[in-house]
């Protein structure tokens, strides 16, 4: 191939790569700086039982019974309302349990629906991360769930 032909091929490849759609980046759920914060002193004292039956919070993905997930991973949390009620979207609060605690709600706002939280690619540093999810139903009953994320290096 002549130098001008090689240059033309390289230019064509460069142009094709420049116009190719970029891979979507994972959304940062927890930063490395947040992950290094100390655990709260009262982590063992988290109460989640109430007298009435508020919405239930279930971790779907990553599998809470699994051995861990590599980041980025799909994060799916399901809300289950009871007795013909619905989850009040503005009541959902997601907190990373550290000292001080970190409000993750603004990062997840666009992924929260009445059925739960669905984040396609959550970027989380390796380690074990505890997240509290608080929800309220249309009758004012509160439900709380603890989501444990085990992230592999």
Label each residue range with its predicted role:
Residues 74-83:
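Short edge beta-strand/loop segments characteristic of extracellular beta-sandwich folds
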